[in-house]
Amino acid sequence: MESVAYILVLTMALAVLFFAIAFREPPRIEK
């Protein structure tokens, strides 16, 4: 079950990175 924990940590890291970029730059999500 260590792969599940690894995937969870990786997802959390990606979410933190995404939110950091999204809140640092002006919102350009919609196309």
UniProtKB/Swiss-Prot annotation:
Task: Provide the transmembrane region boundaries.
Answer: 3-23
What's one Pfam family here?
A: PsbT
Q: Which source organism?
A: Synechocystis sp. (strain ATCC 27184 / PCC 6803 / Kazusa)
This protein's encoding gene: psbT
- N-formylmethionine (modified residue): where? M1
Complex formation: PSII is composed of 1 copy each of membrane proteins PsbA, PsbB, PsbC, PsbD, PsbE, PsbF, PsbH, PsbI, PsbJ, PsbK, PsbL, PsbM, PsbT, PsbX, PsbY, PsbZ, Psb30/Ycf12, peripheral proteins PsbO, CyanoQ (PsbQ), PsbU, PsbV and a large number of cofactors. It forms dimeric complexes.
Identify its protein family: Belongs to the PsbT family.
One Gene Ontology biological process: photosynthesis
HAMAP family in alphabetical order = PSII_PsbT
Its recorded name reads: Photosystem II reaction center protein T
Q: What is the lineage of its organism?
A: Bacteria, Bacillati, Cyanobacteriota, Cyanophyceae, Synechococcales
